[in-house]
Amino acid sequence: MLDIGVNLTNGQFSGDVPQVVARARQAGLNGMIITGTNLTESAQALHLAQAYPDFCWATAGVHPHDAHRWNENSAADLEPLLRSPAVVAVGECGLDFARNFSTPAQQEAAFEAQLALAAQIGKPVFLHCREAHARFIALLRPWLSRLPGAVLHCFTGTRDELDACLSLGLYIGITGWICDERRGMPLRALLPHIPAERLLLETDAPYLLPRDIQPKPKSRRNEPCFLPHIAEQAARWRQQDANWLKQVTENNARQLFRLA
């Protein structure tokens, strides 16, 4: 198993990163990708990845919430991080019109700039989209032929949105959202429609703790060690063997991110 989305730079992990990594290994994970969401956290993600070679890797980018910080120097500041072998994707980047912590115009400018950077450097993109599907697709589509790959992380969209993403060749990241018996039911119904070769699994830790995990953790903090539960639930709803799905999704991640 490989967790493609862990926010290990989040303050909730500030006191026990070694223990979190150890628990992930004990749970059977073979790696995790640490998400970068701004320049500072991307540098921190790279530092953490370098501390755990061949188990942790990083992304580097600017999340749409932080797009208001993007300026004429941002691409040049980001590029050295992206050229590190431990950084395997550009992102988290994309559009989030649900909250608009940055204006849509700021988000679109930062997104397009990062797509250009990914094309220039030759690394895949780690994507975010919330309530912005039409613009997201419109901005992304022209770049796809110049990118080595793309994953829409933490997918929670509709069947039409899923089909549109799959038609463009995107990988689909699925989280513990499928373990929420209230909000996750529509996503559960879509699981069988994601081809196995396009499916990736992630915790998005410390967020999105699977609601149905037993025994319930003392903390609401999600961790990579809970990825096996997500994989088993995904396999259940897809009516597939869990061990097979764990291996297939790891293979997918290694192919997309070009991991050894």
From Swiss-Prot:
Its main location: cytoplasm. A divalent metal cation binds at E92, H128, H153. Keywords: Cytoplasm, Exonuclease, Hydrolase, Magnesium, Metal-binding, Nuclease. GO terms for molecular function: 3'-5'-RNA exonuclease activity; magnesium ion binding; single-stranded DNA 3'-5' DNA exonuclease activity. Pfam families: TatD_DNase. SUPFAM superfamilies: Metallo-dependent hydrolases. Its cofactor is Mg(2+). PROSITE patterns: TATD_3. It comes from the Bacteria. It is found in: Cytoplasm. It is an enzyme of class 3 (hydrolase). GO terms for cellular component: cytoplasm. Its EC number is 3.1.11.-, 3.1.13.-. The keyword Cytoplasm applies. Belongs to the metallo-dependent hydrolases superfamily. TatD-type hydrolase family. TatD subfamily. PANTHER family: DEOXYRIBONUCLEASE TATDN1 (PTHR10060:SF15), TATD FAMILY DEOXYRIBONUCLEASE (PTHR10060). Monomer. 3'-5' exonuclease that prefers single-stranded DNA and RNA. May play a role in the H(2)O(2)-induced DNA damage repair. This is 3'-5' ssDNA/RNA exonuclease TatD. It comes from Edwardsiella piscicida. The gene is tatD.
